């Protein structure tokens, strides 16, 4: 045997260069991670959730180290054993033996290969394993559900917390043993323990013992896997079955097969281990082949035979017991038990008189005519103020009580800063990050009314009534409603965070720098005084953030002083997910005024994907509807079989404070996480009454539940199997929609209490299976007293569903003719608002669809829509008019509108002349309807030119009055021109002038 050839040595310079290159690579890989880690440490500390950061980091590091050392040690043992038991003399196959060359290379770098390969595999395994920290923490802190599964009688906590951990450990042990087997096999082959030369080759005793032992361990691990497979059958779905969980075939064929395979695996393992003593590899080979054949015949073939010849011919009867299990488990897992859901029979098409409709005051006085998915451009046009302020494309719904204590729903929005709308010099780094730092204002519009009647698209009216709580021109907070507000400045929100670098640098450093508001004289600035923000007054933190954001101005700009702070991670949902990484958040957040502050309310869910017998649901599929598709805002593509709205979170819009409240304190998953992160979640009892008044039943949860109720309202397993009594979520009938109809937040009569009091609720119609007729009406209460109660009105017969109702409305002769005139020659774009379904009268359903018009055919934000008509449908009859009151009267007759809200009806009493339009304009065209004799609708009264009577005005007041008069003149010119866009701009100028007049002193 020739001595091994020496490897060429590197020069000192080469070694230095290689070392520098490796150090640079390591720095590039680790440096950003270190910076992010330290920045996150600062950020979590500023929020008061540093314990969350340290707990997660500690768990990840420990898991990484344990798995890396374990996997690396097992692989190292496989290599070390092969090396230490190598033959003393290894014959070669000649001078060109490739194995000899590889052997020489390895021997020359023995430490590199002996330690480097196991270390690399161990580190790689540790990196992957640390991502499973959630599963490990749930195993360590999970408790019991207090409910047992129907097959094995085990508490569901075993399936939720223990079984996933056991499967994780088994997977890593299997991978580690397999890698050790491969390493040992290659080691023996390389060092001569296995030789393939000659007729039969050669295998040393050490190689045989080691390889056989590893194969035996693998088979024993497979036996343990068969044992765990038994439990996982309960969350398994067999193809072609309408339910989830173990069915007849699984219980009577697959389950026994798993036990048989387990026994065979143990026998095969014994046979494999016997080769250690018997020195005959044929026995373990036969055992391995037997295990493979058994898995095919017993594990796959036998269940297939049972399924085809026993179950399928009698499926409804055979699967009946297991369908009942699935129905009960799914209802429990998704919060649809009888304690939560109340079913009531409801005619759906009962006749109603005008008096009966008017008696439903809680519903008729709150009929919603503002569609939050349409009116955002109107908010932008009338309430934007500056180019850099912005409203989201889809606004939110919430409720407040008016001065009389009546519950009313509002379209609400925060006037946020949108960095993407900054222009020219506003985009300069200093301006973007130190001047334009925050939004200003909470805007609310009553959802059941508009500011005037829009009898013609070129007349005034039809726009929302705005209640703007903002910093006024004198620096004081103007808060006309719907609730008192002390701090309208908004530093945190989804719009302001919708850019790559959403940070703002704030704090006292000389004169105020942040743009705040303007008056007639000057621009006034502001200095942030909130508790939120990471201090960046020292050079270390400035350097870190300069590296994080790749921005040198952190180092050289003098706008950063010793009291400066940086606000970043400003999206409310992202902040909640960061401090509660175990939560899945709702796709929508909404602003509310709580205790005189603006807060963002975020719904958080705890989920599982292995609840026994519960149906597995895709969140992205179940929550998709026409609203989500329109803005490409879909939930995570996450599979769940258990969900609870366990946490309500608030994010202060001014200082970013995140507060977590336990909403469902009985949730075992939440209880486990409260043990992992103690003192991070406040008990439900600490939710203030003011906040409780603004908690909504979460939309994503409701959509998941309605999708499941479409199937799991059925009690009888045979009927369930036939699918004959299933329901469907209706498609959105709006011509521009392309997905399911979204649920709608409304204020209407309380279905949970079954009385005529007003309640804020989330509602949805449900169709019959593959039909357009109604099957049910579903309502979830958001009122504190009945929060979470779901009422389902089951509707017999053939009552028109949303699509049929919309078709009847849109094809009605009077409706189509009127809208055809308004939209002629593409002068105006007609848009249908949300089609609401409202239970009214003694047992009927009223469909309400607002109609909007905007100039031209564009979807641009500048073409702001306004309400021009309201259409209704009840028992195959259509009502139509400029207002809710007109439509109710048209549909039910005189008196039906007695309790409705909104502008006075256009129908005037007999003998009363209609008011004439100002400035000599011609009256608008008469509105067609189902009843003749409708008079033209007068436009809103003109704004008075000024105070009446003798009055001595100050200089500022007189100047403001002159602006009002000029704005009124411009408004009249725009009215005569017939240009809708010019008219809107003129109206905005008049509004601004009136505001300045009222604030002038």
UniProtKB/Swiss-Prot annotation:
<feature type="transmembrane region" description="Helical">
    <location>
        <begin position="258"/>
        <end position="278"/>
    </location>
</feature>
<keyword id="KW-1133">Transmembrane helix</keyword>
<feature type="region of interest" description="Disordered">
    <location>
        <begin position="900"/>
        <end position="977"/>
    </location>
</feature>
<dbReference type="InterPro" id="IPR005372">
    <property type="entry name" value="UPF0182"/>
</dbReference>
<protein>
    <recommendedName>
        <fullName>UPF0182 protein Mjls_1469</fullName>
    </recommendedName>
</protein>
<feature type="transmembrane region" description="Helical">
    <location>
        <begin position="286"/>
        <end position="306"/>
    </location>
</feature>
<feature type="compositionally biased region" description="Low complexity">
    <location>
        <begin position="900"/>
        <end position="929"/>
    </location>
</feature>
<feature type="transmembrane region" description="Helical">
    <location>
        <begin position="16"/>
        <end position="36"/>
    </location>
</feature>
<dbReference type="GO" id="GO:0005886">
    <property type="term" value="C:plasma membrane"/>
</dbReference>
<feature type="transmembrane region" description="Helical">
    <location>
        <begin position="209"/>
        <end position="229"/>
    </location>
</feature>
<keyword id="KW-1003">Cell membrane</keyword>
<dbReference type="Pfam" id="PF03699">
    <property type="entry name" value="UPF0182"/>
</dbReference>
<feature type="transmembrane region" description="Helical">
    <location>
        <begin position="174"/>
        <end position="194"/>
    </location>
</feature>
<keyword id="KW-0472">Membrane</keyword>
<keyword id="KW-0812">Transmembrane</keyword>
<comment type="similarity">
    <text>Belongs to the UPF0182 family.</text>
</comment>
<feature type="transmembrane region" description="Helical">
    <location>
        <begin position="61"/>
        <end position="81"/>
    </location>
</feature>
<feature type="transmembrane region" description="Helical">
    <location>
        <begin position="112"/>
        <end position="132"/>
    </location>
</feature>
<dbReference type="GO" id="GO:0005576">
    <property type="term" value="C:extracellular region"/>
</dbReference>
